[in-house]
Amino acid sequence: MHRPARDTHDTRAVHDTGDTRAAHDYDLLVRDSQLLVIDDATEIPGGWVALRDGRVAAVGGPGTEPAGVARTVSAAGRLVTPGLINTHHHLYQNLTRSFAPAVNGTLFNWLTTLYPLWSALDAEAVHLSTYVGIAELLMGGCTTSMDHLYVHPRPRLVDAEIRTAREVGFRFHATRGSMTRSVEDGGLPPRSVTQTDDEVLADSERVVTTYHDPSPGALIRVALAPCSPFSVTKELMRETAELAERLDVRLHTHLAEDRDEEAFCQETHGCRPVEYFESVGWMTDRTWVAHCIYPNDEERARLAAAGVGVAHCPSSNMLIGGGTAAIGEMRALGMPVGIGCDGSASTDHASLWMETRGALLLARYRGGPAAMAARDALDMATRGSARCLGRDDELGHLRPGACGDLVVWNTHEVALAGSFTDPVEAWLRCGPSRAWTTIVAGRVLVDRGEPQLPALEEKLREHARVARRIQRLT
């Protein structure tokens, strides 16, 4: 049995949160693991985890399992980890996956091809894309995801995705995205998917005051997220930062993703993207950004000093040929670095397992085999992502008191045959690409590899109908 040198856990002990009820009064027990990963420093061979009221109440080693639980899930010798956390996504884009006219373009070509299609988005389309996207995320072991919805051809689309996440019981960080610079204003999108600064600010405050839940263990939170430096006005960037400060919510945007963005900022604002980002008040520890491929060494140091987090999106950047983020250097500077799927029309999937594996491969391609191990990649997809969302106290680990979000991975698959010496390395090198059990807030949402969503088949049929309409195929 694999026992990492850093495992100092007393496998005989049961660590409880101190609840006054009986120690065996638990809602759910996951037992008989091959290896239980608590966090980046603690692993328990054969470990178990008990949940109560949607949180981790106790963990322990073989032979110390509590009795009297309401439901028991046998891991049956499988790997158990904290749930993976997605720090950058565009769920609505699964309605235009692998759209042939866009797949071989640059970032700006890709966007200008798809913007006219996305102008057909409505509440039904957002609901269906969110439902199907969450199902896919759950199957890939994701228990928390943000979503960056920045196309608003119709009002209250963010409301539709929040209602859908609540319906499923998924932990969801909605972001009120925005675009205000249409092609007529020197931007890229058509007027049909943009709004005025005043419209964006008013609705941003409405969404936060209506839906944002700052309480511990919250399933729904809201952040503010102008799309990018080239898609909104300077005034909106600055006023959004001020609004986030007043409402005490987080900030998100795309930053330094593409050389075209760099040229745009130089031509429009007379400075590089990071300098512009700092000038509008975004250089703060309430901010995390997507991609961050092209900052230079001095800019990375300034971002790190400010506590800005980064959502690393390896697949979309590789598919579009957009470059590779210097993740090793960022982590060495202490920056919060998490994993993001990015859009389902750029990455063309919503598997955080695949993105975590992609991060491992890219890091080793850039820096050699010592640059990253599977545990480092897992730490990025859990604790690192939780830091980006400002929730590393309760997400990204399985210490008692944490939110009850965890995944059982099937290490008995054909793809893992012969892998005996290190289950974490085998998990990311060999497979599995699909979760066996996914638990969110103590609720089993994937069981034996199947999403526990009775409406999924019907939603898939409806999704296909709407996707064909949006792609103008009917």
Stretch-by-stretch model annotation:
Residues 279-286, 328-413, 430:
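His/Asp/Glu-enriched, well-ordered alpha-helical/loop segment
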Residues 1-47, 52, 382-474:
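Active-site microenvironment of metallo-dependent hydrolases
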Residues 95-126, 181-197, 218, 259-286, ...:
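Active-site gating loops and adjacent loop-to-helix segments of metal-dependent hydrolytic enzymes
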Residues 97-171, 201-216, 464-466, 472:
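Alpha-helical scaffold segments that flank or form the walls of functional sites
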Residues 33, 49, 54, 77, ...:
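Divalent metal-coordination and catalytic microenvironments
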Residues 169, 241-250, 282-285, 302-311, ...:
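Glycine-enriched alpha-helix->loop->beta-strand junction motifs that scaffold or abut catalytic
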Residues 156-292:
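Metal-coordinating catalytic core of metallo-dependent amide/deamination hydrolases
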